[in-house]
Amino acid sequence: LIHHRFAHKVLGRSDWRAVFEVHQMLGSIHFRGPLGVSVRSSLPEGYSEEWHEVEKSPDGRVTIEWVIRTPKRTMKGKIVRGMIPDDPLVSKTVEYPIKGVEDWLAFLDFRLRWLENAKEPVFDEVAEAVKVMGEDGIASVGLTPAFTALAERRGMEQFLLDLYDYPDLISELLEVERQVMEKHVEAFVSSPAEVAWLDICWATGADMGPKNFEKWALPDVVRAMEKVREAKGKYLGLYTLGRIRRLLPMLVETGVHFIETFEPNQGDISLAEAKRLYGDRVCIMGNYNCLVLAFGTVEDAREEA
């Protein structure tokens, strides 16, 4: 994986073309980058989700206002970007738009209206990437699961508390958000891309234990995989972070085609052990220390591999 931030460092650009070009410079294969699909939805008047740049400091720091609107409620958050001069694409949400039950209810209404008005899939960028990359890369599509979609609007800590404080409401929200997710999975299936990855890192990184993961997050994977399994020549994998050892049995059982990243810094299982346990059922990817690749010698990199 070459991150779009690395492409920006090398080329001054961060789009999928820049990532692909850096792969070509290194002689590696593009597998995952900033590519996605969407679904057109003509929301009724008064409903919108928007991001606006509201302030730019001389030092390069940019403040972005995040606004979710319904006719009865407006929810605002704030994102800061550019606070690290040497890595200007790093951003941090410093205020989340969803702040409590009333906001959740308004967002539920927003999502229901989105579903009612969902129309055709949009994948023009993916189609172009597939054509440009040819046999030199895999134009894989990133998909957002329901757990992530809700948590990134509420913030991890508060969202985990909401699972306990308002379980019925969160269950209802997750069900609606899974229907939104399924629309995007269908868009991937309709696109010329062969591979998609479901970004479940918010759920695995939450370290909430197998029982809670199975209850709140696993259905995202199951529902997405059901859609992909129906399509010929399509593959779905999982992007994970954190300690996933205890989650792997249920993740493998869903039938996903690959699992990454088995990170060495915060993970709790090596690629070798995962391959020994599950390598005959799923493709295992990752587990390479990126600091060695970035700052080590050629010999260090060989030893790490």
Model-derived segments and spans:
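N-terminal basic, low-complexity leaders that serve as flexible interaction/assembly modules and, when applicable
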Residues: L1-D87, S91, D124-E128, G134-G137, ...
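Active-site loop segments of alpha/beta catalytic cores
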Residues: L1-S14, E102-A305
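Proline-rich intrinsically disordered, low-complexity coils
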Residues: P34, P44, P58, P71, ...
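Short, charged/polar low-complexity linear motifs in solvent-exposed/disordered segments
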Residues: R81-M83, T93-Y96, G255-V256
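A short, surface-exposed interaction/processing loop segment used at functional sites
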Residues: D86-F110
